UniProtKB/Swiss-Prot annotation:
Top-level taxonomic group: Archaea
Signal peptide region: none
Pfam families, per the entry: DUF134
Protein's UniProt name: UPF0251 protein MJ1243
Family the entry assigns: Belongs to the UPF0251 family.
InterPro entries: RNA_pol_sigma_r3/r4-like, UPF0251, WH-like_DNA-bd_sf
């Protein structure tokens, strides 16, 4: 069966998440329900809620429309609220994304260049 509609355009993120699982303390991961938060949803939340970018600025950084950014924010926030209120684990995985090349990523813009894989390869 072929897929119809427009192909999904990858969203740009600055880096892979440092941690992929968050869960309630004192409970095994196998004992709790899980919420899947996509990497691009996390990036949208990071840019708007944590770094205080406007939705317009964040959408430009991610290479998406404001409407798509709004959808990512809405879904991501809903999933995080569900996990916090109902004691579920948050698993960060999936999504349509690409890591932005050095020179555009947030760390590079703030002068921290040694993190970049391409920078390390030049040494």
């Amino acid at each position: 069966m072929s897929r119809r509609g427009r192909p999904k355009i990858p969203r740009f993120i600055s880096e892979e998440p440092k941690f992929r699982i968050f869960k309630p303390h004192g409970v095994s991961l196998t004992e709790v329900d899980k919420v899947i938060l996509s990497v691009d949803e996390l990036e949208a939340i990071r840019l708007v809620d944590y770094l205080d970018y406007t939705q317009e600025e964040a959408s430009k950084l991610m290479g998406i429309s404001r409407r798509v950014l709004w959808s990512l924010l809405t879904e991501g926030r809903k999933k995080i609220a569900d996990a916090l209120i109902n004691g579920k684990a948050i698993v960060i995985e999936g999504g349509e994304y690409k890591i932005r090349e050095c020179g555009f990523c947030m760390r590079h813009r703030f002068g921290i260049k040694k993190h970049c894989r391409t920078w390390r390869e030049e040494l």
